[in-house]
Amino acid sequence: GPTGATGPTGPTGATGPTGPRGPTGPGVGATGPTGATGPTGPTGATGPTGPPGTVEPNPFQVYVLAGAVGGDGSQANPFGTIQEGIAAVLPTGTVHILGGTYPISSTMVLNKNGVTLQGYSGSIIVLTAPVIPLVVTGNGITVDGLTFTSDNPYPVEFIQIGGTNHRITNNIIFGPPQPGPSDTWVVNRGFVTQSGNMTNLLVRNNIFHTMRQAAYLNPNTTGNIINNVVYNTRGFVNDEAIFVFSGNSWGIPENAVDIALLEGTITGPPFDPITELSENNSLATISDQR
């Protein structure tokens, strides 16, 4: 038969218990894309100019000017004495001895390897006392472009040199005139090697004149003496040393002897044959005392 009519809705039941809490979602969303860079702001005002800087002295390039006071050895503010320059320079550096007259009354000692004493036009060292003005030891030192002389004849050498591989180049070394024959003169000399303590000395392009001897080469020293001019002296004296002489020449007044080979000096090269030694040195007058 037919379905009967729907009965009335029953009353609402009681509310059921609250269900469990669901998981917490992420607190921060994903970072969005970076926005476009904004326009550059205007340049700020220039700040005040700082104080002037200073140039520190360079211990490898030291400058000396005769009579300067209160210097620091820089080119702009040089020392006043060569002694200050030698004290300040570091090994392998150069002491620039600018033009001027430098009176010397006490010995200057240079023993810093590789240092150059560099003279300039008018750089004159004047010895004013009976002392050796310059003693060189060590290795690889150069004395270049200086003039050495004295106010009176003193019985000393201008340069005493010992060590290895030194150079005496482009200098003028002379004494004041002395009366009478040269064998009566005060024994002043251009340079002297330290006995047994000078190896491979180069002496080149110097002028030696108006003193007892251009040089005294002590025993057991070696080197080369090349292209020098010597006059008004008693020449180079070789005392049991071994030096090569080549290209040297002799001026006027003539030397009493150009090269003297003292007793005990070796025979054979580099001295023999004597005729070749003479020919290789502008027909040198040689006193062979061996």
Positions of the model-derived regions?
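Glycine-rich repeat segments that build the extracellular carbohydrate-interaction surface of secreted
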Residues: 62-66, 84-103, 115-121
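Collagen/collagen-like triple-helix sequence repeat recognition
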Residues: 1-62, 73
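Consensus "Asn ladder" position of solenoid repeat domains
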Residues: 146, 171, 205-206, 228, ...
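Parallel beta-helix/beta-solenoid
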Residues: 90, 112-113, 120, 137-139, ...
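Right-handed parallel beta-helix/beta-solenoid
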Residues: 48-84, 101, 277, 285-290
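Short, T/G/N/S-enriched strand-turn elements that build extracellular solenoid repeat scaffolds
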Residues: 82-88, 103-112, 132-136, 157-158, ...
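Right-handed parallel beta-helix/beta-spiral solenoid domain characteristic of secreted/periplasmic
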Residues: 77-79, 114-161, 175-181, 186-188, ...
